[in-house]
Amino acid sequence: MARQSKKKGRPVSGWIILDKPKGMRSTEAVSQIKYLFHAQKVGHAGTLDPLASGLLPIALGEATKTVPYVMQGTKTYRFHIAWGEERSTDDLEGEITHTSSKRPTREEILALLPQYTGVILQTPPQFSAIKIAGNRAYDLAREGEVVEIPPRQVEIETFKLIEMITKDHSIFEITCGKGTYVRSLARDMGRDLGCYAHIADLRRIAVAPFCENDLITWDELKAVELDKSAKNEKDAPFERNFIKLDELLIETISALECLSHYTLSQTQAQQVMKGNTVLLYHHDVPLDEDEVCVLYQDQLLAIGALEKNQFKPKRLFTI
């Protein structure tokens, strides 16, 4: 019988809400967090373009099981639009493809915003991760191929003009649903206003349920990594302070604010951990609910469904 290989790394769980700097790819950020925490498993909840900065939720260990719930959450972006130029990538990185001397007025911009609020059809940028016949659109675009990307529905809850910095630059803030491309918004608004446009700066400031108050920078992480106080002897080979690093993690359950929470007794918890169904007899428990989570001693135990007051576990968590 073949021996199972031991997983490399520590079984550490929780969320790091990284303030991703410009120039770093989301996958690179995940790799660095995995190395820094010497974690067995790490993933992120929503790609952020290399030229964008801001909130990148990174899940470690058991928290990776909650990534889909964060992916479905609303996102808030603050961004600068540069008027007068359209670019191949719809941001500063691309080549200039169209120019205009026209500049929109504040009144023209405000009159346009309602058209970009609510459920709208949006065509993703040529340089995007959308798959076309099995290939990433950005790979085809880099080869000089112009691909036809079908428009898709996205939802924009709020769209605000924050400031007109100059006649060439305006600052906006949006809260939107999954799959919205801010670069496409700039491109389309520029065309509608007859002046062309692209994104000059983009920062994500929230991914529900996480916000700017949860952010931690690379500098802060590195400072904790090098802190020699309260270091565990087992950490010595890594020259990292895992005790202090682990204190920075946000609890796994924090990603599940969108679900109802119910507390189990010890007997119920034991049954759920075996994959068995248990009856929830709390007075406030609904008869049926598609997804809820259950806890034991304030620790996340499982996600599952309620059917006739019975909890059926679908996903278990190690506590």
From Swiss-Prot:
Any GO MF annotation of the entry: tRNA pseudouridine(55) synthase activity
Keyword Kinase: no
GO biological process: mRNA pseudouridine synthesis; tRNA pseudouridine synthesis
Active site residues per record: D49 (nucleophile)
A Pfam family it matches: TruB_N
Domain of life of the source: Bacteria
EC numbers, comma separated: 5.4.99.25
Key words of the record: Isomerase, tRNA processing
Enzyme class name: isomerase
Catalytic activity: uridine(55) in tRNA = pseudouridine(55) in tRNA
CDD domains in the record: PseudoU_synth_EcTruB (cd02573)
Function as written in the Swiss-Prot or TrEMBL entry: Responsible for synthesis of pseudouridine from uracil-55 in the psi GC loop of transfer RNAs.
NCBIfam families: TruB
PANTHER family in alphabetical order: PSEUDOURIDYLATE SYNTHASE TRUB1, TRNA-PSEUDOURIDINE SYNTHASE
Family classification: Belongs to the pseudouridine synthase TruB family. Type 1 subfamily.
Protein name per Swiss-Prot or TrEMBL: tRNA pseudouridine synthase B
Natural source organism: Bartonella henselae (strain ATCC 49882 / DSM 28221 / CCUG 30454 / Houston 1) (Rochalimaea henselae)
